Amino acid sequence: MKVYFNNSCKICKAEIDIYKKQKIQEIDWVDITNNISAEKETLKSDKELLRRLHIKDNEKVFEGAEAFLLLWKRMPKYRFLYNFFKLPIVFNIFSIIYEIFAFFLYIKNKKQLKN
């Protein structure tokens, strides 16, 4: 499983650094900052990658709240988050809140785009 994240975003980096401490061997952490290969692997533009967290697992790309669910499911310490946020009503609310938060992070970080 590959997790595509923005290492240049302080908030994103802080959260991912917490997850990296779990040292899950099956997770490959990929910084999307100026990373053409990340764009090719995910078939996403730099803008799309900057906008949301992405995960590629078994050749399928997940993004946003769905990507977080997959990440938490693979991390024993955070599986309780998966079990809670996968509930349909909770997931719908989480997705909306995630999109709002991700939008503001995107606005803050879009200067990183190549144009």
Residue locations for each model-derived region?
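Local sequence-structure signature of Cys/Sec-based thiol-disulfide redox active-site neighborhoods
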Residues: M1-Q25, I97
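Thiol/selenol-based redox catalytic cores and closely related redox-interacting motifs
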Residues: A38-N115
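Thiol-based oxidoreductase modules, predominantly thioredoxin-like and allied folds used
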Residues: I27-A38
